[in-house]
């Protein structure tokens, strides 16, 4: 995997590299290969991931059809945490 470093801007090149690696799924693969996973554990994990994906797809479909309310989006510029004075 190659990333061009322009004008000696290493930070920008590192950011681009991380983005490429994330897109390729390298971080996820490194995490999975960090230790041995028994075939039964792998099967259970993959099944749980499939269930999660199916639920998410069904939820998105219901939201599109208007049967489920979608999550309210935070107001632009709104601070999520209360200020130090309000605590």
From Swiss-Prot:
HAMAP family according to UniProt: Ribosomal_bS21
Native species: Rhodopseudomonas palustris (strain ATCC BAA-98 / CGA009)
Region listing for Disordered, in residue ranges: 35-87
GO biological process: translation
Keyword terms of this UniProt record: Ribonucleoprotein, Ribosomal protein
Family membership noted in the UniProt record: Belongs to the bacterial ribosomal protein bS21 family.
Protein name, as recorded: Small ribosomal subunit protein bS21
Biased composition (Basic residues): 53-62
């Amino acid at each position: 995997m190659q990333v061009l470093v322009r004008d000696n801007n290493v930070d920008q090149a590192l950011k681009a590299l991380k983005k490429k690696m994330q897109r390729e799924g390298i971080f996820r693969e490194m995490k999975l290969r960090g230790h041995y996973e028994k075939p039964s554990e792998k099967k259970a994990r993959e099944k749980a991931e499939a269930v999660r994906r199916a639920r998410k797809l069904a939820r998105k479909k219901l939201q599109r059809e208007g049967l489920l309310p979608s999550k309210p989006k935070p107001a632009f510029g709104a601070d999520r945490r209360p200020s130090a004075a309000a605590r």
